[in-house]
Design a protein with these regions (language model features):
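Solvent-exposed N-terminal domain segments of exported/luminal and surface proteins
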Residues: 100-227
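Alpha-mannosidase-like glycoside hydrolase catalytic domains involved in N-glycan trimming
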Residues: 20-127, 134, 138-143, 150
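Acidic (Asp/Glu-rich), glycine- and aromatic
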Residues: 268, 274, 279-313
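Polysaccharide-binding surfaces and accessory modules of carbohydrate-active proteins
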Residues: 21-27, 295-347
């Protein structure tokens, strides 16, 4: 009997070994500053079926995340966050398994799409529970702004909170925090008096028709244009976390302004990636074809009386104070710092500030461009409280963005 058991286990060993693959990843910080929560992304295309993963550093388990970017039930990328000292090099061991489920870790990001629950009248404004993760409206829909409870998909890290309006503006509206924590699941952008008394944040920016924080739009030769007309407009959540959330805004059949006569309609996907521990948000702009003959725009709202900063190389920011609502009796004035960082190769011109916006006119060579947005609220106990502090932070932030860690894979 014992001999048979031994032979059975021996026969199973090759299968067990085959079921997992190990990768060694070295991460080097070339900068003379300590860096926290640095995203490390591993493309899984070459590793066959991956159902679960384990990341360790010196034998200690590190939280990781598997993402199915195209929603075909296959994981495309693995993500983990590295804390690395100045000039330090660390090695991480990744074990990939072709069975099981992704390991659970505490959530450090959150994303939500929700419709109002009109049946249960007892629910408060911040207790709505008709959760969805994909919504499409026809281009001739009369009024999509109020279709979702908080007007569009929202997402957050411990440091920030953003919602994207589900209409032709597609503006990023901002939630300011006092404490470094996740809040949107509880407040849904509608913080009640009890939550405010406990130190929860709230909406801190009135955006109107402006860019808000880095909305991506067209350019008609004289001014920014909203994303219309379109055949359909969609929002969806690709990933809920726990280390990064990914949401997409998809415009199909957009008749965008172009530099040629009779341009054809284009499809555009705006992918927003929010990493834990980050106040900045990555924006990927993806098209279904080359858009060399089109012009686009982005920028930030000119907050009333704001002070401007520009390094004339793609980093543009402001610091200002205004009411976050037209109801000036209910709301107090809020001070915010905003910024957008655009690659120089995509900039056609940096336009002078007007009463609404600090604007960049953009071009896209090929089918994709990427940029970043970031902000702070002066309410933060962990943030920045003057224009000088904010602008100094942004200069250091840009250096980190342009000096990535060095990642090497060893199979």
């Amino acid at each position: 009997m014992n001999k048979n058991i031994f032979l059975f286990l021996l026969a199973c060993c090759p299968l067990t070994i085959f079921a997992s693959r190990t990768i060694t990843v070295s991460v080097t910080n070339p900068m003379n500053v300590t860096r926290a929560d640095v995203p490390i992304i591993i493309n899984l295309t070459s590793y066959g079926t991956v159902c679960s993963a384990l990341v360790t550093q010196n034998g200690q388990e590190i939280p990781c995340q598997l993402d199915d970017l195209d929603k075909n039930e296959t994981f495309d990328e693995l993500c983990f966050l590295a804390d690395i000292d100045r000039k330090e090099k660390k090695e991480y061991t990744i074990t990939l398994f072709d069975e099981g489920e992704p390991r659970p870790y505490p959530a450090r990001v959150y994303a939500e799409m929700v419709l109002a629950n009109t049946k249960d009248k007892t629910l408060k404004k911040n207790q709505q529970n008709n959760y969805i993760e994909n919504l499409t409206a026809r281009g001739d829909a009369a009024y999509t702004y109020n279709v979702q409870h908080h007007h569009g998909v929202d997402f957050e890290s411990e440091l920030n909170g953003i919602r994207i309006y589900f209409d032709e503006r597609q503006t990023l509206d901002l939630y300011g925090k006092f404490k470094k924590q996740l809040e949107l699941k509880e407040t849904q952008f509608y913080t009640d008096d009890d939550q405010k008394a406990r130190g929860y944040g709230d909406d801190v920016l009135w955006v109107g028709q402006t860019f808000g924080l880095g909305a991506f739009r067209g350019w008609d030769g004289q001014q920014p244009t909203h994303v219309k007309p379109v055949k359909t407009r969609s929002q969806r959540i690709i990933s809920y976390g726990p280390l990064r959330t990914i949401v997409e805004v998809i415009d199909r059949g957009w008749q965008a302004p172009a530099t040629i006569s009779q341009p054809s309609a284009i499809n555009m996907t705006l992918r927003y990636i929010q990493y834990a521990g980050h106040r900045d948000t990555d924006v990927e702009v993806l098209f279904n074809k080359d858009v060399n003959d089109y012009r686009f725009s982005t920028g930030i709202i000119n907050v009333k009386g704001s002070e401007e900063f520009s390094d004339k190389q793609g980093l543009r920011a402001c610091w200002g104070t205004d009411y976050p609502s037209t109801d000036t009796l209910k709301w107090k004035r809020e001070t915010v710092g905003l910024a957008v960082l655009v690659p120089q190769q995509n900039i056609v011109s940096e336009e002078p500030a007007n009463k609404d916006n600090y604007t960049y006119i953009l071009k896209v060579e090929g089918r994709q461009m990427n940029y970043k947005v970031t902000y702070t609220s002066a309410n933060e106990t962990f943030g920045y409280h003057s224009a000088k502090e904010w602008f100094d932070y942004l200069k250091a932030w840009r250096k980190e963005v342009e000096t990535p860690v060095i990642v090497e894979l060893k199979l």
